[in-house]
Amino acid sequence: MTQMNYTGKVKRVAIIANGKYQSKRVASKLFSVFKDDPDFYLSKKNPDIVISIGGDGMLLSAFHMYEKELDKVRFVGIHTGHLGFYTDYRDFEVDKLIDNLRKDKGEQISYPILKVAITLDDGRVVKARALNEATVKRIEKTMVADVIINHVKFESFRGDGISVSTPTGSTAYNKSLGGAVLHPTIEALQLTEISSLNNRVFRTLGSSIIIPKKDKIELVPKRLGIYTISIDNKTYQLKNVTKVEYFIDDEKIHFVSSPSHTSFWERVKDAFIGEIDS
């Protein structure tokens, strides 16, 4: 746990909610409280704290809204539906959140994020950040690409695509692909194959790979064409991708630390296992 510079100043708060009825109700309550509270100033511009209301999808959207301000912003999530990995409060705990924010001294919990650089055949480089994962797929035909780790060719991949996830993203699409669940205090990336072809002619490792922070992953497609690139909940169609590079970003996402913060393993248990009979 670390702490942002805290001077006791008025906290600038942005409230981001999805369109569901319960989310709108929670947002309305927060607006009504904060607008008359001298300790808070409601503003979506240059906020100190971003409150996301909905679920993990809404938190991902909030992250991308403020991804260029991560060194100044802390996030807090309220879930109004299913349990989320990035949300510490339920919709009936709004009063608890308000009380904790009034007592807040700038403490934060930080998680690593993914940096992606996509090079096109005309030399342009498209850069992006991901909180969960970035995937590359070729829908028309089998994707053929070299997987390079630290400038050394590791394997020639043939299949539907490749997913590279962060530790917190390891519980999302990566897990559905058979990847491992990685604790977010481990600064590493996870490369997981999507429906790889393995036979006498074509072979890949066939299992997820954990890549430490100091290492770099490169994916070099061997065929021109249209590739589907997904960055968290955003999807792009890019033509003639020549290289995709993956790194752990120097910046992290920061969450407001509070007594209500649920441990990572508790979140995993609640999401995938539930109550255990004694």
Curated annotation (Swiss-Prot):
One of its GO terms (biological process) is NAD metabolic process. It is an enzyme of class 2 (transferase). Pfam families: NAD_kinase, NAD_kinase_C. It is found in: Cytoplasm. One of its GO terms (cellular component) is cytoplasm. Keywords: ATP-binding, Cytoplasm, Kinase, NAD, NADP, Nucleotide-binding, Transferase. InterPro entries: ATP-NAD_kinase_N, ATP-NAD_kinase_PpnK-typ_C, NAD/diacylglycerol_kinase_sf, NADK. It comes from the Bacteria. NAD(+) binds at D56, G57, N132, E133, R158, D160, T171, A172, Y173, N174, K175, S176. GO terms for molecular function: ATP binding; metal ion binding; NAD binding; NAD+ kinase activity. It catalyses: NAD(+) + ATP = ADP + NADP(+) + H(+). Its cofactor is a divalent metal cation. Its EC number is 2.7.1.23. The keyword NAD applies. The active site is at D56. The keyword rRNA-binding does not apply. NCBIfam families: PRK04885.1. Involved in the regulation of the intracellular balance of NAD and NADP, and is a key enzyme in the biosynthesis of NADP. Catalyzes specifically the phosphorylation on 2'-hydroxyl of the adenosine moiety of NAD to yield NADP. PANTHER family: NAD KINASE (PTHR20275:SF0). HAMAP family: NAD_kinase (MF_00361). Belongs to the NAD kinase family. This is NAD kinase. It comes from Streptococcus pyogenes serotype M1.
